[in-house]
């Protein structure tokens, strides 16, 4: 895989496009820098959920980076946000998160000139991709903050993804998602169909976590509608330097339900482990 510069550091507040070569074609990647002038500060890279994008994070990444004095990079994966949409006939395979971690993320870092060890902040699918990246390239990451990541597929997850499918077909959910994606169908059906694909029920990344060497802060809401606490507890059982934060009165999106607790815990965690 190769990567080529289409745009680069764009400053705070506006998104830009970078181009990588993936799956044999050029793919635009929407991205936005936060406080790039903080050149000596830790870099936090934000990886969104299965239906997320740059815009869907809203101002949370900026709030977090300002609280900790960090730099930030927010981006939309292929098929999401302003990034290149998924072709209508393109289906994702069971290894779709592995490909994001092993192929897309390194290519994006290359085209943007990221040579340091970033901190990855991933939510849901983005949390799983963060874990897979750290397992695949353990020397290339400083640490992980993962919110409601998936290690394996649970009945609870499938039930609520089936409910999301019905909502997309029968409510104004497509219109709502259209505010955050150039092609809402690209974002929704790529995610929904692979999660409901019967072979995906066997997807499990627990054994791969043994290769992770960096510290991990794993956060999950007690009321998470897409997974049980066995997901983050599974990380702690395999990764030595794991801190768990189990939040009451919190669902699948801790950064929305309990933003200040997530910000405080993340700033403390990064400051604890950052290199002087």
Short names for language-model regions:
Residues 237-253:
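Catalytic histidine neighborhood in serine/cysteine hydrolases
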Residues 116-154:
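Conserved hydrolase catalytic core segment
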Residues 34-87:
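Conserved HGGG/HGGXW glycine-rich cap/lid loop of the alpha/beta-hydrolase fold
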Residues 212, 218-220:
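Short beta-strand/loop motif that positions the catalytic acidic residue
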Residues 24-35:
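A short loop-to-beta-strand scaffold at the N-terminal edge of the catalytic core in hydrolase folds
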Residues 249-276:
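Catalytic active-site module of serine/aspartate enzymes centered on a nucleophile-bearing elbow/loop
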Residues 223-227:
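Acidic catalytic loop of the alpha/beta-hydrolase fold
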Residues 74-117:
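Active-site loop/oxyanion-hole signature of alpha/beta-hydrolase fold enzymes
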């Amino acid at each position: 895989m190769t990567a080529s510069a289409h745009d680069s550091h764009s400053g705070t507040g506006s998104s830009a496009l970078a181009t990588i070569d993936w799956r044999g074609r050029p793919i635009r990647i929407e991205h936005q820098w936060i406080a790039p002038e903080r050149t000596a500060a830790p870099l936090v890279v934000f990886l969104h959920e299965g239906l997320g994008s740059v815009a869907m994070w809203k101002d949370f990444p900026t709030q977090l980076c300002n609280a900790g004095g960090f730099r930030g990079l927010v981006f939309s994966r292929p098929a999401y946000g302003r990034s290149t949409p998924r072709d209508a006939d393109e289906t994702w395979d069971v290894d779709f998160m592995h490909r994001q971690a092993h192929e897309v993320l390194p290519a994006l870092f290359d085209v943007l000139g990221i040579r340091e060890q970033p901190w990855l902040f991933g939510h849901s699918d983005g949390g799983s991709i963060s874990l897979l990246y750290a397992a695949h390239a353990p020397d290339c990451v400083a640490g992980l903050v993962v919110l409601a990541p998936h290690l394996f597929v649970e009945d609870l997850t499938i039930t609520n993804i089936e409910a999301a499918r019905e909502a997309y077909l029968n409510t104004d959910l497509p219109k709502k998602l259209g505010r955050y994606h150039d092609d809402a169908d690209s974002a929704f059906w790529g995610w929904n169909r692979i999660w409901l694909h019967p072979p995906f029920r066997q997807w499990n990344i627990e054994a791969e976590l043994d290769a992770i060497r960096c510290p991990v802060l794993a956060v999950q809401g007690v009321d998470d509608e897409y997974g049980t606490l066995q997901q983050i507890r599974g990380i702690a059982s395999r990764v030595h330097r794991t801190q768990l934060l189990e939040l009451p009165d919190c669902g699948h999106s801790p950064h929305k339900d309990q933003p200040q607790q997530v910000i405080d815990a993340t700033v403390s965690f990064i400051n604890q482990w950052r290199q002087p």
